[in-house]
From Swiss-Prot:
NADP(+) binds at residues 86, 135-139, 159-164, 224, 248. SUPFAM superfamilies: Aminoacid dehydrogenase-like, N-terminal domain, NAD(P)-binding Rossmann-fold domains. This is Shikimate dehydrogenase (NADP(+)). The gene is aroE. Involved in the biosynthesis of the chorismate, which leads to the biosynthesis of aromatic amino acids. Catalyzes the reversible NADPH linked reduction of 3-dehydroshikimate (DHSA) to yield shikimate (SA). It comes from Alcanivorax borkumensis (strain ATCC 700651 / DSM 11573 / NCIMB 13689 / SK2). Belongs to the shikimate dehydrogenase family. Homodimer. InterPro entries: Aminoacid_DH-like_N_sf, NAD(P)-bd_dom_sf, SDH_C, Shikimate_DH, Shikimate_DH-bd_N, Shikimate_DH_fam, Shikm_DH/Glu-tRNA_Rdtase. Its EC number is 1.1.1.25. PANTHER family: BIFUNCTIONAL 3-DEHYDROQUINATE DEHYDRATASE_SHIKIMATE DEHYDROGENASE, CHLOROPLASTIC, SHIKIMATE DEHYDROGENASE.
Amino acid sequence: MSGEKDRADTGLYCVFGNPVSHSRSPEIHHAFAAQHSDPVQYEKREAPLDDFAGAVQAFREAGGLGANVTVPFKEQAFALCDAITERADQAGAVNTLWWDGDQLHGDNTDGAGLVKDIRNNQGWTIRKKRVLILGAGGAVRGVLGPILAQEPTLLRIANRTKEKAEALAGNVMKGEGPPVLGGGLDNLMGQFDLVINAISAGLHGEMPALPDGLLAEGAVAYDMVYGSEPTPFMRWAEQQGAAATADGLGMLVEQAAEAFEIWRGWRPNTAPVMASLR
């Protein structure tokens, strides 16, 4: 890891995405760095859709030490790495890059960030709860391992195309772990204690139709999407009687803190940063 040894000089980092103009990552990482007067420069870089590898190489040549990766490049980042962590391997996607000599390393901090936000910031438990995840894209694949490590009673993945949800459930199902079930949104049944939305359409005001009665008494709802006001999914959950709802801003900050610690060798305090972003 790059860690403390880089701290004498300004460390150059970035977030790769396309589009990336909306990203709040520079704001977050500069706020982290300010906590210890750690000299960090963090910028947004829009990588061409057809040349992510070239963008990474150009950043390295410009003196870059590490990077975050957002949509749609996480799978490409995974393929580019010389070495990856176990949780990145599990996710099949990388959101955090750093160089050690000439070796490009990759990690996936999304699931750890989600679990930290749910447990530490929201004060919700996952252990022995019935968990429903809406969606089966890359965002879901990145968080399944850390959620299952919390030992829920069961985990159901529901997606518009049920085959994708079934395939994802089959990939992570382990004999000794909690049951992981996959299926379509149209035949979704049962009651759940924690519902997590990872359908990206939720950003633009379009939630798929969901049946009534999915939320058990005392259930909580978490949207991996975040915005300046409650998301359509959060509003749906409130109408369905959720005891509490949260958006994904805390996950964004917590996964960023995990990445920052890999790069700089110390862990920032996330609470004041979350408060300032609101």
